Design a protein with these regions (language model features):
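Post-transcriptional modification and biogenesis factors for structured RNAs
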Residues: 1-137
């Protein structure tokens, strides 16, 4: 989460975290990890994915990412203000979400089947900078 927090700050993005978290974010943990930028991060925590999705504007552009998706990341035309949604590091997005939002779910291409998935922070970086590239920044 430290790497993703840094990514969000560097790209002026808001980090939304969905509970339950698989890690602790406390002032002491943040200080111990040397995350001196954390206090500047736009961070919003949500009790569940349902609460998060319900909190979005009705016209929000939501884009989901999963290794189980059929369409590659590069098939997506990003819009300014898109919400980029990833699953947890160990399990990814749940099958129910992938099925419900299949038309808005994409994958980062991988070319070796021995790799189950990319590290979450790496995946987020790839997607965020592809969106920025497409938007002409």
């Amino acid at each position: 989460t430290g790497s993703i927090g840094r990514l969000c700050l560097a790209t002026n993005s808001t980090l939304h975290l969905i509970e339950p978290l698989g890690f602790e974010i406390s002032d002491s943990r943040v200080k111990r990890a040397g995350l001196d930028y954390w206090k500047y991060l736009q961070l919003i925590r949500h009790k569940s994915i349902e609460i998060f999705l319900d909190s979005l504007p009705t016209d929000a552009s939501t884009v989901f990412f999963s290794t189980k998706a059929k369409k590659p990341l590069y098939a997506k035309e990003f819009k300014k203000g898109s919400y980029l949604i990833f699953g947890c590091e160990t399990k990814g997005l749940g099958d129910e979400l992938i099925e419900k939002f299949s038309k808005d779910t994409f994958k980062i291409p991988q070319y070796d089947d021995r790799v189950r998935s990319l590290n979450l922070a790496n995946a987020a970086s790839i997607v965020v900078y592809e969106a920025i590239r497409q938007l002409g920044h």
